[in-house]
Every structure is written in C-alpha cells, then in structure tokens.
Amino acid sequence: MRLQAKKSDWTGARETLNAKLKAGHMPRDVHKRRDAVLALSAAKEIVDDGSSIEAREAAIEANRLSPDLIPAAVLAAQGYIAQGKPKYAARVLTKTWGVKPHPDLAAAFAAIAPDETPAARLKRFRVLTKQNPTDPETMMLMSELHIAAEDFPEAKRALGDLVTDDPTARSLTLMAAIERGSGADDAVVRGWLTRALTAPRGPQWICDNCQNIHS
C-alpha cells in the first residue's frame, strides 16, 4: 500500500486497504482514518489536474469518512462554496470544529463571506466559536476577531491565560498585536515578538501515507 501511495495510485492503495479490512488484518477505525487520508490525497491530485467537480466529490467523501480530519473538511467546504452552497460549507466546518478546532477551519469559514465587515464576521463566527469555547484554538480565534474589530481589551480577555499557561508562536504574536493596538511602547511589542520566535508553532497533523508533517 505504501508503494502505491508513493506512486500516487490512490485507487489501488484504497483497494489494498479494503482488502486488509475484509481479511481482518486491520481494525475498522484505523481503516476509516487511513482511507480518509487516501481519499484526501486523491482529492489533492485531482485539484492539481483542474478537475473541480471530481475534486469536490472526493473531498466530500473524505470528510464523511473521517470528520475529524482537518484538510478533508476544508476541501469539502471549499467544494460547497464553489457549488454556491455556503450553508453546507458552514455545517461541515462547524461540525469539524466541534471535534477538533484548527486554524485552517477558521480560514475556510472566513472564505464563505470574504467581504464582510469585522463586526459582521465576529457575529457570524459565533456559531463556530460556541463549539469548544475553552479550546486554545477557539480562544485565539476570538482574540483575532476582536483585534480585527479593533476591540483590543476584549481581544486580550479572549486570550485568557494562554500566553502564560500554553504559549505558542501564534498566541504570543496575537499578544504583540494587542499591545501595539493598545498603544504600548515598541519595546513591549518587540518583547512579545521575540518570545514568539522560539515558541512552539501549534497544531499539526501527520499524513499516514507520506509521513510528512503539515501545519
């Protein structure tokens, strides 16, 4: 199966995977997860070839098989947006955010209405942020939305204690933006940015097939 994946023979790899499941050599949950990754890989290949209809179908299939797989959900949402079905895109992303918040999901959710005002975006995103409200990703997203709306005190409140309890490059960069927006000295802003340079990057996922790390 790995050889097939290396050759981008996603159909063959999925057939091998199904054979392993039927033979009892693989647990069903592992099969679902790996099949979703293969479907996602196929979707990316199709996107590169410019076959948008097939890409949407493959991406939606991948999302149904494994709703916690972030890239599949994003591709499925992009497919719905291209079809003029923004409500379906929002449902896919909201469901996935409820399983595992991730910045790529927020970016895809923003793309549903790219020209909205910061205030309108803050309101629309509430359907997303009410899922997993105490997750660090949700807290950072709320902070970003308030920064865009130039409500810096609320942006700082949204971050909570993340910069001390769970500092990442992103949360520290957000704190720098909050300080700058609040009128802090340049030295204070630089201090936060300096800390961000050496902080952990945040969530990543590892492809089961290519073993590459993706942010």
Label each PLM-derived region with a short phrase:
Residues 1-215:
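Repeat-based scaffolding regions
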